[in-house]
Amino acid sequence: MKRIILALALLSPALAGAQDLRHPWTLRECLDWALEHNLTVKQSELNVAQREIQLNTSENSWLPNVSGSVNESLSFGRGLTADNTYTSANTTSTGFSIGGGMNLFDGLATPNNIALSRLNLEAATADLERAKDDIRVAVARAYVQVLYDYEIVDVARKQIELDDAQVARLEALAATGKAAQAEVSQQKASRAQSGVTLVQAENNLRLALLDLGQLLEFSSSEGFSIERPTVQVEEILLDMPERIYADAVGVRPAVRAEEIRLKGTDKSLKIAQAAQYPSLNLSGGVGSNYYTTSNAAYPQDTFWNQLSHNFSPYIGVSMNIPIFTRFQTRNNIRSARLNQELQQIQLDKAKQSLYKEIQQAWSNAVAAEAKYRSSSEAATAAEDAFRLTQAKYENGKATITEFNESRNQLLKTQSDRVQATYEYLFQSRLLDFYRGSALGL
């Protein structure tokens, strides 16, 4: 019984996950799940936690360090006694001490190191937000791809329904001698080709769901589906890339992280320069000893009396003045200045990359908008043309070849319209996302 209970306990997370997959997932659910389970995001979260520890360590560097020690020694033969004389005897010595030291001045290296640790934490937090943004975009893109493939499957199924109706119609006409058997066979061939198209569309849908499930770190995407919201394409007046970039550069975490790191290089330079200045340290402590000597010619003090008599506190201040460090300090300063220039280039590259991304998204949105308009017009025209061709075909005024050509053209224009719809929807939302808006449909 215990084994059964244990097995059920181990299986319960998997069963809970399977139950979660039984309902269609919304985009918000997918995004929330991905942010919680994505390994890259988890790695960035651990990096933030590590930086928090480093900041705490830096802040505590102002505190004094305190340590204690206990020693016990035993000497044989001629040795030094407690009264500072030498004699041939066995001598034991027990010592106790506690001491500490504190940094008073180190050329402002400590406050700059604390500031650097704080900036490193801010940069790590920005990196975490960047990782989250990357997974948000990837999940949204995959989600839209699934929606597109759903629509293509619907289009393919409608074509099969149309072909089935035509096959049934021709078979009925052929039975009465009003249609040739060749027409029936040709229509069945068209029906078979539509079946192949449907199989391909369904396979593409399964692959799209698999891709989305992998982004969500699902161990299995079996039974996984998404909610199909009502998509309404609105006419959006797109701002120019320059204006979008002006809004985005101040909020994008990728740029903000590099800006913070550039500030950090200034602190690193000051830390390197601090090695040019003298350092001042305070130290102090207390200690005591206890001695025993065999064959002593006089009575020895007790343990506690000796500790009291030998008690010796001390305090001191030391200054370390750098004179020649084999050019290490000079080279560290040079290296810190070079790191500043390198980080400035890294910041410029991040801004340049952001601008290119916005330009690409803007160009894609403009192209998708134009394609959506033209494909919508083409699909409407193809629907009208197909209705006319279908009516002619059913009245014997059009051939089956003309009918199938019109049907194939309708399928193509409908597919193009669906693709343009979701591409325009995603690219326009992506531009809003660059400006700081949440991703959504």
What spans do the regions from the language model cover?
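Short flexible linkers and secondary-structure junctions
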Residues: 19-145, 280, 284, 327-330
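Bacterial Sec-pathway N-terminal export signals of envelope proteins
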Residues: 18-67, 71, 77, 220, ...
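Sec/SRP-type N-terminal targeting helices
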Residues: 42-46, 59, 90, 104-132, ...
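Short segments within alpha-helical structural elements
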Residues: 193-218, 379-437
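Terminal intrinsically disordered/low-complexity segments used for targeting and assembly
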Residues: 1-33, 202-243, 297-298, 432-441
